[in-house]
From Swiss-Prot:
Transmembrane segments: none
GO terms, molecular function: ATP binding; cytidine kinase activity; uridine kinase activity
Residues where ATP binds: 15-22
Name of the protein: Uridine kinase
Protein origin, superkingdom: Bacteria
Record family assignment: Belongs to the uridine kinase family.
The organism of origin for this protein: Serratia proteamaculans (strain 568)
Lineage per the UniProt record: Bacteria, Pseudomonadati, Pseudomonadota, Gammaproteobacteria, Enterobacterales
GO-annotated biological processes: CTP salvage; UMP salvage
Length: 213
């Protein structure tokens, strides 16, 4: 890939935790990859850019408000998006939900024709918004998000139900109302009903497919 500006198209998918962002991103990636090939499309989760907390104790890490913009290393994410757009590869961080910090390993990611970026706080940062070619907000009722989050965090991330509920009441819901929901105004497309909205996914596929022509 050359250094031609904006050759890498960035598509942002935001919304509440457990709203269906990852499902939409993975569905779009899988179905478009089958059409154009793995070398032309990739996915970057915002969760990979939670700040490194290896200098903190486990007790301190647990107290971090992971739903506040300050928990994210958006400076690094912004830098990586600029690198990809200028034709340079990046080392994508990996985050451990059980250790509450970054892993030592990274994933080498070459520039792609299209990068799908998904995460809860993407649209809160003007720099990230300006790097996106277009953005999507997945608008799912909070009670549904809570049920999905409890199932996911208990089954996949080793959390207890009590800790998930306590975190939801203390930070997840308040931060959604303060930061995430207001960022919906910056989205180009709002998708209701989450990742199982097949009509919305087909419309998004058609839109993204234009970048491969």
């Amino acid at each position: 890939m050359t250094d031609k500006p904006h050759q890498c198209v960035i598509i942002g998918i935001a919304g509440a935790s457990a709203s269906g962002k990852s499902l939409i991103a993975s569905t779009l990636y899988r179905e478009l990859r089958d059409q154009v090939g793995d070398e032309h499309i990739g996915v970057i989760p915002e969760d990979s850019y939670y700040k490194d907390q290896t200098h903190l104790t486990m007790e301190e890490r647990v107290k971090t408000n992971y739903d506040h913009p300050s928990a994210m290393d958006h400076n690094l994410l912004f830098q990586h998006l600029q690198m990809l757009k200028s034709g340079k590869a990046i080392e994508l961080p990996l985050y451990s939900y059980t250790e509450h910090t970054r892993k030592k390993e990274t994933i080498h990611l070459e520039p792609k024709k299209v990068i799908i970026l998904e995460g809860i706080l993407l649209l809160t940062d003007i720099r990230l918004r300006q790097e996106m070619n277009f953005s999507i907000f997945v608008d799912t009722p909070l009670d549904i998000c809570l049920m999905r989050r409890m199932k996911r965090d208990v089954n996949e991330r080793g959390r207890s139900m009590d800790s998930v509920m306590a975190q939801y009441q203390k930070t997840v819901r308040p931060m959604f109302l303060q930061f995430i929901d207001p960022s919906k105004q910056y989205a180009d497309i709002i998708v209701p009903r989450g990742g199982k909205n097949r009509i919305a996914i087909d419309i998004l596929k058609a839109k993204i497919s234009q970048f491969f022509e």
